[in-house]
Amino acid sequence: MAILKLRNVAYQAGQKQILQNVSFEVEEGAFLTLIGPSGAGKSTILKLIANLINPTSGKIFFREKDIMKIDPLIYRRSVSYCFQQPSLFGEKVADNLSFPYEVRKQAVDRKRLLQLLHEVSLEADYLDKDVTSLS
């Protein structure tokens, strides 16, 4: 059974047509490689699948459900996107660990942040360290 289906997906940025009538299926457990020249739309397809951008037309299904109708928090437990260029969400370690709380408009749980540091063998003072000082 296909875990992912794209049906006639198109994407347009301004006046530029990036993708047109893209359709394919990925079976559960399968690997998929997207190959093409720079600007061919590979990253755009991945951003569409991750629901970071919306298709101009067409549908994307995950486990037989239209991804536009799945709660984004639930969808992101199964599907994510790793950017080609790493992105950080502030200057301090605490800024980056707090980001998920901010996205969900929740109060930052400092106790949980300290627990996360402990799980990776880092001391509490790392919360205030500049991210560029870490390797």
Report each predicted region and the residues it spans.
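Helix-to-loop junction immediately C-terminal to a conserved catalytic motif
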Residues: 50
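Short beta-strand immediately N-terminal to the Walker A/P-loop
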Residues: 32-33, 81
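Conserved ABC ATPase signature
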Residues: 130-135
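Conserved catalytic motifs of ABC-family nucleotide-binding domains
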Residues: 86-95, 104-105
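The feature captures the beta-strand-to-loop junction immediately N-terminal to the Walker
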Residues: 35-37
